[in-house]
Amino acid sequence: MTSNPVEAHYTRGDLLQAVLAGLVAAGHDPEHLEAGALGPVEEFHTFGRQGTVALAEAAGLEPGEHVLDVGSGLGGPARHLAREYGCTVTGVDLTAELVAVAAELTRRVGQDDVVTFQQGDATDLPFADDRFDVVWTQHVSMNIADKPALFAEMARVLRPGGRLASFDILAAEGHPTLHFPVPWAEDASTSALASPSETRALLAGAGLAVRVWDDVTAEAAEFYAFLAELPEEPPPLGLHLLIPNMRVKGANLRRGVDEGALTVVRCVAEHVTPT
């Protein structure tokens, strides 16, 4: 068992078995797996697949681009970017179990030639400078306290002119009180939200010039209300396989938005050469 509290939060221990059992219960053959079968479980961020599509369109992804997915989870977004946009995707995640399961699911859908995963720390990325055309991250920074290192590392591995595509939950200005648990943290000890102004300053400090800044908090509130109303008896495949007690956590997200404690932002920033 890991001693890192963030990795521990996302470690189940039997995740692959749970996902495969869920696939069977939902009527799918895990040995002949189609990509669409994983939809209910492979994207655990606001809006699910729709959030991935919106960020990809904002980033203007092009065929042949090499994308680094920081905090790649079960690999759903990475597989989607490779399948729909013709990108090669490298995923990196702190949680060893997520990396292993993402790689196995990717093998089962036949995309392991263009989508790969490895374990790594977002504040100390195991990649060379200027390697990627796009750095992609969704709902990851909320667990990372060392934000200057995070943004510096994402900029370091981006080629000049490359883009950072991020989709994150932020603290409202002034950091109002947030109620726990939430999907990324059981309590405040592993939650590290930045405000919009703090995030913009971090981007600028890393040489990342904002090109798109979309506040989608109002739309997110509706999604969080949906999470709060999930059935007590969940379907075979769903976010409950990764994040227990999702109804309570979804309700706290909605409460955070309603009370003005949270904001949700889609951002694209360009890696500019310092003058």
Where are these regions (language model features)?
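Class I SAM-dependent methyltransferase SAM/SAH-binding core
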Residues: 66-70, 74-124
